[in-house]
């Protein structure tokens, strides 16, 4: 092996040790390009490190999106905005700046099924992941079951601390299934712990006056609504269902 190739292999070996993925995979071609174009040492080093940083940023975005556990990837750019309910159209521009995360505010998207609530929530979540925030998506029924299991296993405090690492938690489908007092109390505690510290997005098919049907406790219902809506964005997503319109169109 020539001295040149030995040097390339040593560069790659060092890059692997330092977890420099781009340098490890592209050292040879980058060095060849620098020699061919008579690139200065400082320009070569700057170019190489910039590409390493770009790769890490991109990998970080993909990793955060994967860890968020979205059921599918829906982007804000895919929304047919003129078909959203009026309140959703009016407030989306403010929400997509993600200032609500910086300000530790919540979002409640309330309206009948099929109007874009979950799409907006996931779209905001993916954008947050791409901007460096830690996000978790979970349906409310699954969340309550997880909380109840942790209580049975005496690990609730550990689970609450784990939830605290997330800048944004999306709690989808509140209202589709009611739960008992224990489940309501556990969910209330989680929401209270995040209040004014981290952001939460709730999607629900029920207006606030019907939330007692979920929690079966008027005092707890009032307390949860108070925690969620304090300094929050409440979006009225009542309107014609996207899915119903698509189904009717297919039947024509």
Residue ranges and their predicted role:
Residues 16-71:
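Interdomain "pre-motor" coupling segment immediately N-terminal to P-loop NTPase/helicase cores
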Residues 74-98:
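N-terminal pre-Walker A segment at the start of P-loop NTPase domains
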Residues 102-107:
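Pre-Walker A (Motif I) flank of P-loop NTPase domains
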Residues 109-111:
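Hydrophobic anchor at the beta1->P-loop junction of P-loop NTPases
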Residues 114:
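Walker A (P-loop) phosphate-binding loop of P-loop NTPases
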Residues 117:
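Conserved lysine of the Walker
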Residues 120, 124:
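Hydrophobic positions on the alpha1 helix immediately C-terminal to the Walker A/P-loop
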């Amino acid at each position: 092996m020539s001295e040149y190739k030995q040097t390339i292999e040593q560069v790659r070996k060092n890059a692997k040790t330092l977890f420099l993925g781009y340098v490890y995979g592209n050292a040879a071609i980058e060095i060849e390009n620098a020699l061919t174009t008579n690139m200065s040492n400082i320009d070569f080093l700057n170019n190489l490190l910039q590409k390493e940083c770009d790769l890490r940023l991109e990998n970080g975005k993909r990793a955060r999106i994967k860890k968020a556990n979205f059921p599918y990837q829906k982007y804000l750019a895919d929304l047919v905005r003129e078909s959203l309910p009026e309140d959703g159209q009016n407030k989306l521009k403010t929400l997509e700046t993600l200032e609500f995360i910086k300000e530790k505010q919540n979002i409640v998207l309330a309206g009948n099924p099929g109007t874009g609530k979950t799409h907006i929530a996931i779209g905001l979540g993916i954008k947050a992941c791409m901007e460096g925030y830690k996000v978790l998506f979970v349906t409310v029924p699954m969340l309550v079951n997880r909380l109840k299991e942790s209580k049975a296993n005496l690990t609730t405090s550990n689970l609450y601390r784990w939830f605290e690492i997330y800048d944004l938690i999306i709690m989808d489908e509140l209202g589709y299934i009611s739960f008992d007092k224990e489940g309501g109390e556990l969910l209330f505690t989680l929401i209270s712990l995040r209040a004014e510290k981290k952001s939460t997005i709730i999607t629900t098919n029920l207006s606030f006056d019907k939330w007692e049907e979920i929690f079966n406790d008027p005092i707890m219902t009032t307390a949860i609504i108070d925690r969620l809506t304090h300094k929050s964005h409440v979006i009225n997503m009542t309107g014609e269902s996207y899915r119903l319109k698509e189904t009717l169109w297919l039947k024509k």
